[in-house]
UniProtKB/Swiss-Prot annotation:
Protein name (Swiss-Prot/TrEMBL): Iron-sulfur cluster assembly scaffold protein IscU 2
Record's subunit section: Forms a heterotetramer with IscS2.
InterPro entries for the chain: NIF_FeS_clus_asmbl_NifU-like, NIF_FeS_clus_asmbl_NifU_N
GO molecular function: 2 iron, 2 sulfur cluster binding; iron ion binding
Lineage, broadest ranks: Archaea, Methanobacteriati, Methanobacteriota, Archaeoglobi, Archaeoglobales
Family: Belongs to the NifU family.
Signal peptide: none
Species this protein is from: Archaeoglobus fulgidus (strain ATCC 49558 / DSM 4304 / JCM 9628 / NBRC 100126 / VC-16)
Length: 153
């Protein structure tokens, strides 16, 4: 059963859309259940000034995307990187076990958007400093994250 917050973010998602001139874009997906999320960020003075998402998936996928963008908006890049999968689920009042992969995808899409921002701005040293090299490697190979262990679709 979903919490009232999940229903609210599903029925009234915040920050839906695309930023055409995004400073960073992160896309992740789960081939098991078909969820696909893209998060776009606009950064000014090391702070996420604007953030949007496009998600194709279930109610939990849309709600977690909405919540992750709400949590990240206005935060510094470093603060946004601290937004965890569990924090997204907790902010929504919890998720059923079989939907936890959605919070994983939302947090990972945000992290990928930040890695993309660093890459586009020649800050590869920052990616290494923050231990995000594996994320960059997956992005460069075009790999999607698979959180199938959480998905019972």
């Amino acid at each position: 059963m979903y919490s009232d917050k999940v229903f609210d973010h599903f029925q009234n998602p915040r920050n839906v859309g695309k930023i055409e001139d995004a400073d960073g874009v992160g896309t992740v997906g789960n081939p098991v259940c078909g969820d696909l999320m893209t998060i776009y960020i606009k950064v000014k003075d090391n702070r996420i000034e604007d953030i949007k998402f496009q998600t194709f998936g279930c109610a939990a996928a849309i709600a977690t995307s909405s919540m992750a963008t709400e949590m990240a908006k206005g935060k510094t890049i470093e603060e946004a990187l601290k937004i965890t999968r569990d924090a997204v689920a907790e902010a929504l009042g919890g998720l059923p076990k079989q939907k936890m992969h959605c919070s994983n995808l939302a947090a990972d899409a945000l992290r990928r958007a930040i890695v993309d921002y660093f890459r586009k701005n020649g800050k590869i040293d920052k990616i290494k400093e923050l231990g995000l090299e594996k994320e960059l490697e997956k992005m460069e190979k075009g790999e999607m994250d698979d959180h199938g262990e959480y998905c019972e679709a």
